[in-house]
């Protein structure tokens, strides 16, 4: 079983036959990149997961139809405007984005997926978007993957990307994901925007299955502010260029592919959580010993979404009482008299609660852990055999500042 190799110097355009560029179309102004095109010179099969928010942005509604196409070649995405709550006009503009991209690639509009992120309820400035698409294709096929990532960022402070390679059927296979996400992150079936590309040769049904199974334990297990966006999506394109034997059953090759895809999605999820708006720390909640998989996930997410827990981590306060409180009001089945809680990092661990009762623990040692930029909260419910992990971030003064002036 095969080793997954992470290559930090590689990017989305290092996956064979994929091209990408980002340009400034004028949506954001100040010559900031705000439109990207990603496409494959070979036809792809595609899978996607989308926001469960009842209010869905126009690009999401469009993609729910286009994702069913036999072939997908491209993704076109803009930042600075969500094209959400914009009615029929917004849907028509999302289609125009696909149509304009398709014209340049000499393909059908339904073979293009569309994404937008930014302010909700403002009409999409389609003239600027069209200008941006024309500008992008005046540069392509010359690629610049970093500019493509920049073009989908809003309040993000760092780029989010990961590139892995592994072996399937004695063929080298690659997967790369780029993403944006900082605020309004509490996904259910998707993330903010995550674009994943691979040269694996796999059927559409199994690509869908692998993505949906992975999303449950990656993007769906992160939260920054408990707000599920109108625009959330994770898109996965596979062009089959690696030449591995077609994965058409849930065999060992499928398991290897699924493992690599899940690794990519988990790492991107952690990057998004760590870059929460104003965040200074990544919080990782590990729950053990739950009576069901659902209870484990519910308990872990309750810990990382608690504002009191998040604020305590920001202040390096080992206030385990807030953690057991969050477990208690969650929908998970727990027996408080069985719960153990500890704080840890990669170097040390401090137990603070045993069987629901506080311990006389070393406050300074706990504070040292909490002062770090990656805080692990371990909870053992001692109630079963199921485990789960969720990721979030601390709650800082800057979160309020950023979101108090987002439109300005």
From Swiss-Prot:
CDD domains: OAT (cd02152). It is found in: Cytoplasm. InterPro entries: Arg_biosynth_ArgJ, ArgJ-like_dom_sf, ArgJ_beta_C. GO terms for cellular component: cytoplasm. It catalyses: N(2)-acetyl-L-ornithine + L-glutamate = N-acetyl-L-glutamate + L-ornithine; L-glutamate + acetyl-CoA = N-acetyl-L-glutamate + CoA + H(+). Its EC number is 2.3.1.35, 2.3.1.1. NCBIfam families: ArgJ, PRK05388.1. This is Arginine biosynthesis bifunctional protein ArgJ 1. It comes from Clostridium acetobutylicum (strain ATCC 824 / DSM 792 / JCM 1419 / IAM 19013 / LMG 5710 / NBRC 13948 / NRRL B-527 / VKM B-1787 / 2291 / W). The gene is argJ1.
